[in-house]
């Protein structure tokens, strides 16, 4: 009985009180100071952090953890967890849970940070009304439903790996500022009343066909890559700085209201004509690769740093006014025969394998290099087809390196040194 045990002077570290042998082992090792096989009131009070590694056990029970009313942080690594009840751990602030399966979970409403890496969680992650919640992290695994409606959550994000999640419910989360998930199998998203959102990233967003962001007037960054969305309105999102609709079904967009846009990506979409922006001189990154676009007008794109026009239908590319360019990708752009980058002194990467380029002018680009962390240079690799003349500067330190690399790859390159 919980109330009897909680009011007693001590709790025996037995299988009856703590069915998990891994939990008993941790308690004996770290908290049974006098090694009498029991936890005194003082020892129980001192249990503020608990780390239970049960990966070698087939299943684990957390029965007994409810006694630790002073517990602040719990790290649990397990295989099969049938049920977790942390509702009585009122002071619990941080939960880190990594498991193969979790079938049922009940949490303390005073949680601040949670991290889940669960391969299979068929139950609902229920954070409704959690007024102290700040961050939810989901890592590699399959989850059914996340419901954080009415909570104080500020950030919902993934860890290092994509997740599978069917439902996201976060209505009326007044403090929510960022939802950043690389998520598959998504069927439903409800963010109504969450109007303070600044970042919304739903990459690989499964079966989602519609998304209404009209009331998210503070939105700065929006990504809906890999969705089935065919139309998307951002007319009300005047603070938008980054938009990524790559790998979606979208064919056109009205961006006339988005004067603060800096990053625009629409790779592998049905867009067949360059999307018009109201303030082209603010654009720093443009990715229109893998589309049927046949022409690009970049005369006013004076701040452009990164351009990806790989596998497009363009026949010419004028970037004379784009003096800030750092990377240019035109890989597989077979109809492009000439590329003049003589004005680009800040250039580091030019990726043009399998393109139709016969002449490439990089005479003022002394920074092209793939021997540091700043870029991949020309990205000469076996398997690509390159046959062209490259005009380079005599002071370019990497010339011999790339000449040798081109020979090793079997490329037919004529080097003109100026």
What are these regions (language model features)?
Residues 60-65, 84-86, 105, 125, ...:
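Canonical leucine-rich repeat
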Residues 1-75, 90, 126-131, 140, ...:
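N-terminal capping/linker segments that flank leucine-rich repeat
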Residues 50-53, 74-76, 95-97, 114-116, ...:
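Conserved hydrophobic beta-strand positions in leucine-rich repeat
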Residues 47, 71, 81, 92, ...:
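Conserved hydrophobic position(s) of the canonical leucine-rich repeat
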Residues 53, 77, 87, 98, ...:
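Feature marks extracellular polysaccharide-active and adherence modules
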Residues 310, 321-393:
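Ankyrin-repeat and related helical/solenoid repeat scaffolds used for protein-protein interactions
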């Amino acid at each position: 009985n919980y109330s009897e045990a909680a009011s007693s002077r001590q709790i025996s570290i037995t299988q009856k009180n703590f069915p998990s042998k891994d939990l008993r082992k941790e308690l004996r090792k770290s908290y049974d100071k006098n090694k009498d096989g029991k936890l005194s009131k003082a020892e129980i009070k001192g249990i503020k952090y608990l780390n239970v590694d049960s990966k070698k056990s087939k299943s684990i029970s957390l029965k007994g953890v409810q006694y630790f009313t002073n517990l602040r942080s719990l790290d649990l690594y397990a295989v099969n967890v049938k049920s977790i009840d942390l509702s009585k751990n009122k002071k619990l602030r941080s939960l880190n849970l990594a498991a193969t399966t979790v079938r049922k979970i009940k949490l303390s409403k005073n949680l601040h940070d949670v991290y889940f890496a669960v391969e299979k969680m068929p139950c609902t992650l229920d954070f409704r009304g959690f007024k102290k919640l700040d961050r939810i992290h989901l890592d590699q695994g399959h989850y059914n439903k996340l419901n954080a409606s009415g909570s104080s959550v500020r950030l919902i994000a993934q860890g290092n790996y994509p997740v599978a999640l069917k439902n996201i419910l976060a209505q009326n989360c007044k403090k929510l500022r960022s939802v950043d998930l690389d998520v598959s199998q998504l069927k439903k998203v409800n963010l109504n009343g969450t109007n303070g959102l600044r970042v919304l990233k739903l990459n690989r967003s499964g079966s989602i066909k519609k998304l209404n962001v009209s009331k998210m007037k503070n939105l700065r960054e929006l990504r809906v890559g890999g969705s089935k969305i065919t139309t998307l309105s951002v007319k009300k999102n005047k603070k938008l700085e980054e938009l990524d609709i790559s790998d979606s079904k979208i064919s056109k967009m009205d961006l006339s209201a988005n004067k603060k846009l800096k990053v625009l990506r629409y790779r592998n979409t049905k867009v067949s004509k360059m999307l018009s922006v109201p303030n082209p001189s603010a654009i720093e990154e443009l990715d229109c690769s893998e589309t049927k676009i046949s022409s690009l007008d970049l005369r006013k794109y004076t701040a452009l740093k990164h351009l990806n026009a790989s596998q497009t239908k363009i026949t010419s590319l004028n970037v004379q006014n784009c003096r800030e360019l750092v990377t240019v990708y035109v890989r597989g752009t077979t109809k492009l025969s000439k590329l003049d980058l003589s004005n680009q002194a800040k250039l580091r990467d030019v990726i043009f394998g399998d393109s139709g380029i016969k002449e490439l002018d990089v005479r003022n680009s002394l920074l092209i290099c793939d021997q540091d962390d700043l870029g991949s240079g020309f990205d000469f690799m076996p398997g690509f087809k390159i046959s062209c003349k490259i005009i380079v500067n005599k002071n370019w330190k990497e010339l011999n390196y790339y000449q040798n690399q081109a020979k090793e790859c079997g490329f037919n390159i004529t080097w003109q040194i100026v």
